[in-house]
Structure formats: C-alpha cells, structure tokens
Amino acid sequence: KRIWDGQDNVLEIGPFLGGSTRAIALGMMLNPNKKNLARVYTYDRFGKYHKPEELLHFLAPMFERGILGETEKQFILKNNSFLEVFDIIHRQFEYYRMIVPQRAILNDIPPDQDSDNEASFRFEQDQVTPFNLPEELTYSAVFVDGCKSWYGTKQFMQITLPKTSKGCYYIFQDYGTHTCFWLPVFLQVFNKYFKLVAFVDHTYTFELVEELSQETISKNFPDSPADIPRSEYELLFKKLQASAINFNDTYSVLNYQLQYAGLLGYLGYRDEARSLIVKQLNSPFALTHRQWILRALEWSTYDSQGNNIDLFLPKEI
C-alpha cells in the first residue's frame, strides 16, 4: 500500500520467466485499494537470451516435476522462445489474471546510427515489436530489470515517464549490478527528479518527486556515454559515493567504484579501469566482496553489442 496506491497499473520490463512478476501480481491482489482493472503489464523479448540447450538446462526442474513436457521442449528447440513457457508456468494460478505479458525490445543504439538496422539490438533481429506503451494506460509503479544498455535506458525512460506521475515508484533491479553503470548515472543526472527511498541487495527504489519531460532527458542525457566529458563523470561518481556514505550503504561505496571502472573501460581507459578495480582488492571491501571484485575485473561491463570490455587487452595503436 505504501509503494503502490492501487489506482493505476504496474509496469515491468525484463521478467524472464516471471519470478518477480508473480510476486508483483500477488502483492497487487492483496492490496485493498486495487482497482478492478489494474494489471501488471510485463514486457520482454521472451527469447534468444540463451541457446535452446542452455534454456532447457535452466528449466530442467520444471521438466522433472512435469510442469513442462515434450511439446514445450520441442517448441524451445525450434523457436528459442519462452513466452509460451512463461504462460504455462503461471496460467494455472489465480494471480495470472493480473498479468499481461507483451513481446517488445529496446534499442541498444539509436536506430538512425545503424546503417543496416541490425546492430540496434544486442541480439539478431526478429519480428518482436519495438517497445512502446498504450496511449490509454498509466502506471504508478515501474519495475526495471530490462534496461541493459545506456541508450536502452534512455529510450525506456523517455517512453515511460510520460505515463507516470509524481509519487510513482521506480524499482531498479540492476542498479547495484557493477556492469550497469548507466543506471546510477541516469539517476544522478536527474537527481532532483528522483528520491532514493529504499534499497535491498542490488535493487534500489526511487520515488518520482518531480515530473521529468522527454525534452529534459534529450537535453541532458546524450545517446552515448562518450558524449559526456570525463570530468563530469568524476564529479558525478564522487557525489554518488558521498550519498552512499550518508545512507550508510557500504556496498554502494564499493560498487560505485566498480561501476566507474566499467565506465572508464567502456570509454577506452582500460589501464585505469583495471588499476581501480585491483585497488579494491587491497581495500577492506575485499574481506566481504572479494569474488564480486574479481568478477568485475573479469567482466567490467559490455558494449552496445553485448561484448565484454576486456580490461586486459592491449591498447590499440
């Protein structure tokens, strides 16, 4: 009741197989203020994250329990899609009436910068509809787990913000993931519009405290990370760290360092990025987060095509 007022719909992007979607729908059903027509609209490309064999391995427990059968197996092998699997998993439960799954994709680079219209998406093109929202719907809670790129985040927020009002909560499930530096950058650039209200593990919840226009986003958040001066990033991440200290959020004090290193690597400063991450191994953070730091050293972030930014590659001449 404190996060969702029950009056508008809930929006989710990136549900995968719907674990979070299920929790959202169950919570909505328990809210006494829920309007009858309120639903959770969940968007995903519902396919091609994994090779079919990998997806089948991930789903093995459901095959063993009889939830999925040979028909679903053959469908996955043939189509590399899991929307039908999503439906089978949830349709037997009452909460599924609250869920409206939709196929859609976000661009990872601006379409007008892509001469062959193939690199706009991290995965090969298919017939999935580009992400958009129905004109008649509004939302008062937004769960974000599908903004896996800088431009995709910009596109999502430009489309979504006009459908939400002050008081809407945005729940960013990848905010604390070291690869996704664009999320804290976006929220810090527009920090007067968003107020941090809660965080658990990697998930950070912000309240929209002032309406943010598409024009303001276009003016202040460019299409590429390379279009912001490095000096601005240095100041931005210092402010983020200061905020984390004020919240006694020791994990983010470390993670902002890892995200800044990922950004440096993305911009081509690989030696500096590597040194910054290695430095964390000699800090007190390594006592509790050593594996997380080593993971960042191995996979600091990725480019718009989904390729790892390898911090151990020699500089290009």
Where are these regions (language model features)?
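S-adenosylmethionine/decaboxylated-SAM
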Residues: I3-L313
